[in-house]
Amino acid sequence: GLPYRGARLLEAAMAKGQMKASAENQQLLAQLWEGAREWPKAVDSWQLLAKQHAQPKAAMRVAELLLQQGKTEAAMTQLVAMKSTKGEQGNRAKALLVQAHLNKEQYAQALELARELQQHDNWQQRATSWVNYIQAQTDGVNKKAA
């Protein structure tokens, strides 16, 4: 498809020095690989953008794609490093970590992060639904054990 061809052309042009490997071009390349559903190449491109151009949003996108691809451990490594970031970026990392912990049925860790997110207005509703879900899950586990 078009995204795949676009990504191949852009990647080749950047490799040959015909186009600058600028942050904008690197981001476009990552987006094209995503559009082509070439997940490993998309992850690599976002990772490169995050490292070379110090872009936290790119690092966040890497974590999202890793989670989407079922690579929970790799995503968690990325997110743990980002969760202490101030503001919305840190909260987004915590939210993704909640999801990762839920994927692994690590309810205590998920609950702790969800409760932290409840303190922030724009995350309160989602975090509360996570807390309710986690409590329902752990109640079910406790009843089965009894």
Residue ranges and their predicted role:
Residues 51, 102-125, 132-135:
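TPR/TPR-like (Sel1-like) alpha-helical repeat modules
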Residues 11-20, 46-55, 80-88, 115-123:
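Solenoid-like repeat scaffolds
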Residues 1-28, 40-41, 47:
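Extracytoplasmic and endomembrane cell-envelope/extracellular-matrix remodeling and assembly machinery
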Residues 2, 20-27, 52-61, 88-95, ...:
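Generic helix N-cap/helix-start motif at coil->alpha-helix transitions
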